């Protein structure tokens, strides 16, 4: 019987903690539910103490108690009274006049101490309910429905809208099963209406967010039409929201008004929100007068920022200047309900200071900051919107807005409005007025001073006045050391002066102050590119690309870095991303064509060059490449079209007209080629190359004009020799350049024309022709071929003997023409 009683041993004194975790299982309350004896005691009156009917005699303390079994000696306690729980032979019994609960006469016969009557065995348990009973099934089904609704809401909050809808549908199906089962077991009055309402409302909400508006409206109709649901009429506002999304403005307004009628007047906030929705619907429907009525009512009952802002927009839409002013004044008088004084510690009490510091950045303070930022945004936007129209000029309008703001609780916004006024002047190309306003602001307090100086620095930088830009950048930095825009402007001025290392330091400082300053990150990438630190530049642009995913400038810079790193495949890949962002940029398309040309993919290069030409047909380099491409493929007529366009774009460049004539000659149209050469000679009478081509072509065609052109060529060459001698006498070393120039001209006359021999672009040859500065002198590089020795072989129209004759060096053997007139 005593196996459940654990007594601490008296002799074991070595281990102080022995038996520390031992306890009497009687006191294990967690197992009481499974304790049959305890459950019997709870269900019955077994073991309860009877009411006390006598008092303990005072003599019981001093004399032993005699029983029917003989006199026993009592054990005195430390306070002089007998211990009530111990007798001889280890059998315990009460030592009071009243028998305690759990003590019987059986204890005197050697029974163990059993206060809970565990020796009697477990009592018969109460009849348990069957798990498959209808009530248990209903409870279990209710639990499952609630869990499905919760899971649907959680999935919606996590952004998994499809899963949320599926869970809501499952909850609806199980709820209908639950209703049918409950109707079979109990009366209809016992149906859980709250559960039905929550299931239907959640299902309608999930339909709405999944843009299944018809199903959502049907579900809301089921709720609204059921008179058993209290306050279901407010859901008509949700139905109005759905109609608003569907742009069914008349029905949206109808349901908003029905919801408004069912909201009691004491619920003022809800009524205000519904009226705001009505106003927004009227604005989207273009009914500004009706919207004005709604917002005017709101501003008279409970003015708020959104209503005041929308009211200003409505008056702007109908063009009422005076009402615009009044609406703006109402907007700036809306109370913010922000107490700034509570964030200032009034005493030196450390506890108070600690509390003040704790609430300076708590959630409530963050909400107040967001509310203030929203108010400033609405006021600034409204001022910029109405300032150009409320007065005769936008300057007067801004002045009126500034005066009104200065007299309100938003005094600090007045300076921001002045800066916006300067920006407006810049948009109107009035540079001087903008600078004057910013210079006035630059003399005010530090915050405005820094902003004004930053803008002035940017203006002077764009005007190439780097000294003034640097000066104002210094002022801005000194006024606010943590202004990233000021540090970026200072870095720009240093960058313009070529000190790239110092510029990088300013950009780094700007990034340390504001890690989201994309301008500084972009500029530091350009700086590293200038310093030829390409890996670091690439890291900067890749970081910027992670922030600005669709920035064409950043993508182009990454492609440019890969090109500098001699990785054309990666450069092409990034340029393709640029084209996906801005598919009509001719510069990017021409760059792609250039890279494909370097890789030897002429077909892809032609595709992108042609696309670039379509979007911008005035790019000389693109026209030049396309002309060379058609020459390579021997489509002379196509090449003529591009060179003629180039001659229109650069009429002072003789090389384009010479190229046109050369293409005519190669296509076999000698008469057209001769006319083109003659026309070129009339425009550029001192061009040596044109005269040489005329002499050769007229001689081959047997024309009498050959003698005249030969005399002009001889006279022109003599004049050129005299000019070169004068240059040589005044400057040393010019003779070598003259020899190089003459040798180049003579060598070109005898060489075959090939625009792409050995992979060379035509531009390398065309640049050898005279430019705009020296239109009549021969070039120092290869010139356009003037001979008839053609790499394509003999022309079909010409006999073979003529082709052989052209190869002969004595083509111009004529007694009237001197050898000095022939091209070397």
Curated annotation (Swiss-Prot):
The record's account of tissue expression is:
Expressed in the heart, brain, liver, lung, kidney, skeletal muscle and pancreas.
Where composition is biased (Polar residues), the residues are 748-757
Report the PROSITE patterns cross-referenced here: TPR, TPR_REGION
Alphabetized GO MF terms: kinesin binding
Gene Ontology BP term (one): response to silicon dioxide
User: Compositional bias of type Acidic residues: which residue ranges?
Assistant: 809-824
Which stretches are TPR repeats? Answer: 197-230, 233-266, 272-305, 307-338, 415-448, 450-483, 484-517, 518-551, 552-585, 586-619, 620-653, 654-687
Q: Where is the composition biased (Basic and acidic residues)?
A: 797-808
Q: Which GO terms describe its cellular component?
A: centriolar satellite; centriole; centrosome; ciliary basal body; ciliary base; ciliary tip; cilium; cytosol
Q: Predominant location of this chain?
A: cytoplasm
What are the entry keywords?
Cell projection, Cilium, Cilium biogenesis/degradation, Cytoplasm, Cytoskeleton, Flagellum, Repeat, TPR repeat
User: Where found?
Assistant: Cytoplasm, Cytoskeleton, Microtubule organizing center, Centrosome, Centriole; Cell projection, Cilium; Cytoplasm, Cytoskeleton, Cilium basal body; Cytoplasm, Cytoskeleton, Microtubule organizing center, Centrosome
| Sequence segments annotated as region (Disordered) | 113-134, 724-824
- Please give the function described in this protein's UniProt entry: Positively regulates primary cilium biogenesis. Also involved in autophagy since it is required for trafficking of ATG16L and the expansion of the autophagic compartment.
Q: How does it assemble?
A: Component of the IFT complex B, at least composed of IFT20, IFT22, IFT25, IFT27, IFT46, IFT52, TRAF3IP1/IFT54, IFT57, IFT74, IFT80, IFT81, and IFT88. Interacts with IFT20, IFT22, IFT25, IFT27, IFT52, TRAF3IP1, IFT74, IFT80 and IFT81. Interacts with IFT172. Interacts with IFT57. Interacts with IFT46. Interacts with IFT70B. Interacts with C2CD3. Interacts with ENTR1 (via N-terminus). Interacts with LRRC56. Interacts with DZIP1. Interacts with CCDC38. Interacts with CCDC146. Interacts with CFAP53.
Q: What is this protein called?
A: Intraflagellar transport protein 88 homolog
Source species of the chain:
Homo sapiens (Human)
